[in-house]
Amino acid sequence: GADCQNFVYPASTTVVQQVNPVAPVVTEVLNLSADALFKFDGSSLNDLLPQGRVELDNLASNINNVYSQVNKIHLIGHTDRLGSDAYNYQLGSKRAQTVRNYLSARGIPNHVISYSTQGESQPLTDGCYIVKNKQALQQCLQPDRRVTVEITGVKGK
């Protein structure tokens, strides 16, 4: 009867293949204020302010704890318009390089971190040309002094 029926025509089996979804690769862009990181016109490790060290420690911790995979981190140094183009280009590069070295010392693999500079070529302000007082001008141009951090990887641990 029924036993022979199952023997001749076996009950169908369903094979379910479990596929783990691939987490999307995302790029997160952060702007770190150079004024929070460095003394005015500074770019070296010795020029890092206490708050700047805290900010970079938090960034390194965030990268290490939030990302299961880091494909690349690109740092871009920016300056305000004060000073020559050549000087600002160099200053932006030195700031980005200092941030790279700091993150590397905090466990971020050196080979995933690259850096470049835009100098004064990508301001966030309108240049603050109407501001004449030197101290007020430095304050007005503050948003232009920054390091942009572009993190590309997979979030989630």
Please annotate each region the language model reported:
Residues 31-42, 56-96, 110-126:
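Short, surface-exposed beta-strand segments enriched in small/polar/acidic residues
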Residues 1-72, 136-138, 152-157:
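Periplasmic peptidoglycan-binding/tethering modules of Gram-negative envelope proteins
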